[in-house]
Amino acid sequence: RRINRSKDKNSTTLVKNIPYGSGLSGGVRNKRWYQKNRENILEYQKWVEDWGEELFRVLKPGAYALVFNSTRTSAHIQVALENVGFYARDTIVWRRQSGIPKGLNAEKKLESMGNPNAKKWHGWHSALRNEWEAITVVQKPLVNNYLNTIKLYNVGLMKTKSPNFEGFQSNIIENIKRDPKNEYNSHITVKPLDLIEKLVDMIIPKIDGNIVIDPFLGSGTTAVAAINLGIEWIGIELNPDYVEIAKKRVNEAINHSKIQQISLDL
């Protein structure tokens, strides 16, 4: 509903941190379990289509949408956004500094049950250690070609060279340091500011009229990144606790910046 307020073709890009919809975890893996898991992921895909349709409307032709998601749901995110009109471009890999193994350790579980064959399952696990997150990259279709689109709308290309990194930018991003913890930011999935700044800088030229929109603003990292880069932004967040955190972070960023424009949709 908040996105409905935005004008058609008004915004230039999108950096998002949505609920991941990773599905069921525990329970007996019977037919009903798999059926319910399938129903959940299809409901999740439909939910993505619902907000994706509105985002497609407000973005300029050639604008990119970047969507953080889990490795288990990235395919459904891409299909959902393609269904509403976006064109699939890439998947960016954000390689984190560490990952915690999750799932069943067969040897330890069998040992706790007194199973004599436990040692035979040494090193066997129900999942790999996950140390990367998928960032689905889609684009609103161009107007005929890239050059025509950038002349009309000032978006459509990706920055591949920058003083912030060496060589030609790849679709694997790593060596991003975590932000230091502070006493007031209680958001559980805060993305590193350096990462979000890198992504915004990669897909949005610093040209008047370009606006970053984040419909899942959370604690405000996208807003802070935009302020630091000197780019206008729109943030939408429904959780009142996160809104207050975002306001505090935005005000701190403004105090350290010459940019005095703030757009925070409550």
Placement of each model-derived feature along the sequence:
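S-adenosyl-L-methionine-dependent nucleic acid methyltransferase catalytic domains
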Residues: R1-L266
